[in-house]
A protein has these predicted regions:
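Short helix-capping/hinge motifs at transmembrane helix termini and TM-loop junctions
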Residues: 55-60, 113-114, 150, 154-158, ...
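Juxtamembrane helix-loop-helix connectors linking adjacent transmembrane helices
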Residues: 92-96, 118-187, 197-198, 202
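Cytoplasmic juxtamembrane regions at transmembrane-helix boundaries
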Residues: 111-130, 200-213, 322-326
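Transmembrane helix-loop-helix hairpins at the membrane interface
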Residues: 171-324
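Hydrophobic alpha-helical transmembrane segments in multi-pass membrane proteins
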Residues: 40, 44-48, 106, 134-147, ...
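Juxtamembrane interface elements at the cytosolic ends of transmembrane helices
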Residues: 104-119, 149, 187-191
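N-terminal, membrane-interfacial amphipathic/helix-forming hydrophobic leader that caps
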Residues: 1-114, 276-330
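Interfacial aromatic "cap" segments that immediately flank transmembrane helices
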Residues: 34, 126-140, 209, 251-257, ...
Length: 330
């Protein structure tokens, strides 16, 4: 029996197994999109109110009631406010709200399809937590040269981790808040790689459609349509989709996604309420290509090096074909 090539093998990923008639029902899909987004928005609204209360108190507006909440929201949205309290507030509010919306959506989708939520995370018998750490470590190694090059190109501006506060205590608080980006990456992967890849596969399992469509939807969902940001997110989404299909779960992609976000807010720029629209430069194209290449190399390192597979708790049966170095790419 002929073994499919690397690209074709992605369509046979174990992560796409057991897709049934419920996933193939257009009516049920529309119901999931409408119902899941509705309950997700309700959850996000409630979480916004809850997370804004401590921020309002921290900014000294606690005695002003509803007006105080409005003042805190205005401070959070002010692009000229970048002090420690605001930066931590942006990280906390953004991650909690996004996590709430996406997690509720994924849970609604799983319930509508009569599935356990875990099916959107992994095809392995259990969540491979060590694979998350392997993804975090390898992606950090792959992305560090790109971050360094970006800093050199920008004229080596002050590191956010140092400039956000003058003292060690403030910097530690900032790092602690930035760590919320790890569960945030996990929830994003649960929806945009877990649920979305399986849902697309219910109608078409061709790798180009699976990876291309999920990458475009992932980029569009950030509502930042400036050419440079959209292209970067789309290529990042393609790389994360490749990881998920190749390794049979989102765990490695969670680590890679989290590493990307952490490196940005700690060493490039803090979380911002505004993004400047810029044309796609040659440097941007090179770094985007390097990002995608780094994701591919890191994934194949796990596939092809037995010690990395053992470290990440990856079994050969969970890898899409071809699953060994002697199989010719095709």
């Amino acid at each position: 029996m002929n073994t499919p090539g690397l690209w074709a093998g992605l369509g046979e990923s174990i992560f796409l197994a057991n897709i049934g008639e419920r996933e193939r029902s257009p009516t049920r899909l529309v119901g999931v999109l409408i119902g899941g987004l509705a309950v997700g928005i309700v959850a996000a609204t409630c979480i916004t109110c809850l997370t804004m209360i401590p921020l309002t108190l921290a900014l000294g507006h606690g005695s002003e009631g509803i007006a105080g909440l409005g003042a805190a929201a205005s401070a959070l949205a002010d692009p000229n406010r970048n002090d420690l309290t605001i930066q931590i507030g942006r990280l906390v509010v953004t991650t909690f709200v996004d996590d709430g919306l996406l997690l509720v959506f994924a849970a609604f989708a799983a319930a509508a399809m009569h599935r356990q939520l875990r099916i959107y995370a992994t095809a392995a018998p259990r969540i491979r937590w060590r694979l998350v750490l392997v993804g975090l470590a390898l992606a950090t190694l792959a992305l560090t040269p790109l971050v360094t090059a970006q800093r050199v190109l920008d004229g080596a501006p002050p590191l956010p981790i140092l400039s956000v506060a003058p003292d060690l205590g403030g910097r530690v608080l900032y790092v602690a808040a930035a760590l919320l980006l790890i569960p945030a990456a996990a929830v994003e992967e649960l929806v945009f790689r877990g649920w979305l890849l399986r849902q697309i596969a219910a109608f078409n399992q061709r790798p180009l459609i699976l990876i291309g469509l999920s990458a475009i939807i992932f980029a569009a969902a950030h509502f930042d349509f400036s050419p440079d940001a959209f292209l970067t997110r789309a290529l990042m989404g393609a790389g994360l989709a490749y990881m998920t299909l190749r390794l049979g779960g989102i765990e490695f992609a969670v680590g890679a996604h989290a590493a990307n976000n952490l490196l940005i807010v700690l060493f490039l720029q803090p979380l911002s309420v505004q993004s400047q629209s810029e044309p796609v430069s040659m440097f941007e194209l090179i770094t985007d290509a390097a990002l995608l290449g780094g994701y591919f190399i890191a994934t194949e390192a796990v596939v092809r090096w037995p010690w990395l597979r053992r470290l990440g708790d990856v079994r050969p049966a969970e890898i899409s074909p071809p699953d060994n170095l002697t199989t010719e790419f095709g």
